[in-house]
A protein has these predicted regions:
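Conserved ATP-binding subdomain of kinase catalytic cores across diverse folds
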Residues: 1-101, 105-118, 122-123, 129-138
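C-terminal catalytic region of ATP-dependent kinase domains
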Residues: 6, 20, 43, 128-219
């Protein structure tokens, strides 16, 4: 793992790195635990929540979060996430204007609801070179207390697509995979499944809750 530089405008220490295997190289985003700013409402080890978000996305079959693994790097243990070569002029507030992205954004919305994402800024939705939208910066998820802060309220009050309901039901019925369970506390696991069950049963995106439901800054 070779450090290429520190990413600007990140609350926690976040680095662009180059990783290699068998002669092949790729860029990745490295978030070491040592670089995390202490929070009163989240325990240390936010990088594990980045990992958990990836495994939840995979368990649902949605593929929203770039490949994320746990690695020992120059600044210690942390998460290593595949770098998205995105069009950084695009973010949620621009992407939501294109009907072609609606299904993908609806899944990100549902994902944030059950993961209890406390920080879904517009800039955390990236448009990849293949036209696929990715959800990044998922470290403030899975709190047992209501923490939802998101800019994605365009679906408020709308029926939940049946495909999303089916995936949520499947998750609840099968339970969490060991790779995901190992990253969360018992109450966090139970709350995650409870939120998924409630959303599937309700069958509708919740209505907007007011100003406190938005992260700051929004982009």
């Amino acid at each position: 793992m070779t450090l290429k530089g520190r990413l600007p405008r990140s609350t926690n220490a976040t680095f662009l790195v180059e990783v290699g295997l068998n002669g092949a190289t790729a860029l990745a985003v490295y978030k070491p635990e040592r670089g995390e700013r202490p929070l009163w409402d989240f325990p240390p080890g936010l990088f594990r929540r980045e990992l958990a978000a990836y495994h939840l996305s995979e368990a649902l079959g949605w593929g929203l979060v770039p490949l994320t693994v746990q690695r020992e790097g120059p600044y210690g243990e942390g998460s290593l996430q595949e770098f998205v070569h995105a069009d950084f002029t695009q973010h949620y507030f621009t992407l939501c204007e294109d009907p072609a992205h609606r299904d993908r954004l609806a899944r990100i919305c549902a994902f944030d609801l059950i993961a209890n994402n406390a920080d879904r800024k517009s800039g955390h939705c990236l448009l990849g070179p293949d036209g696929r939208i990715w959800a990044i910066d998922n470290g403030l998820c899975f709190n047992v207390d209501p923490k939802l802060r998101t800019v994605i309220w365009d679906f408020a009050g709308e029926p939940l697509p049946e495909a999303i309901r089916d995936d949520l039901r499947r998750l609840v019925k099968s339970g969490l995979r060991p790779t995901l369970s190992a990253l969360l506390e018992e109450r966090e696991r139970a709350t995650l499944l409870s939120r998924a069950k409630r959303l599937a049963q309700t069958g509708r995106f919740p209505t907007e809750g007011g100003g406190e439901r938005y992260p700051w800054p929004a982009v």
